[in-house]
Amino acid sequence: MRARNFNIDSLAVSKTDREDTSRMTITLHGDDVAVEQAAKQLYRLIDVLKVQDVTSDPTVEHELAFVKIRATDSNRDEVLRLVELSRGRVVDLADGSVIVEVTGTESEIDTFVSLVRTYGIKELVRTGAVVMARGSGSIEEAIKR
């Protein structure tokens, strides 16, 4: 993809309900021509079953982030309040830091990261977006067409 000047913003790969199939969610920005070219490049790969452009479709989209935040005795309560307000979850609490799991859209996670940046981010990792089209249809049905 990079050789064709497509910059991938996020990439998520996972198992599906089919043992022999994995699903990739690739997020990239570009005009309609660029998106179409990216789809054509993906179809040239071995064993690509379906490329689905959901740019203009109603979708559910989330990503996950783990954020290790510097947390001292003096600011720990403030940090934990921000976690609660952001619907995050504390997954590790240690002397001097707290690891938080946050899920949401890219902008929701960006907002949380901005809010806690003033306390000091010791480490940050994000999954990239996973996306599913809303409604009763499925990618499996699209593959069979």
Model-assigned labels for residue ranges:
Residues 1-145:
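A conserved regulatory-domain signal marking ACT and ACT-like small-molecule sensing domains
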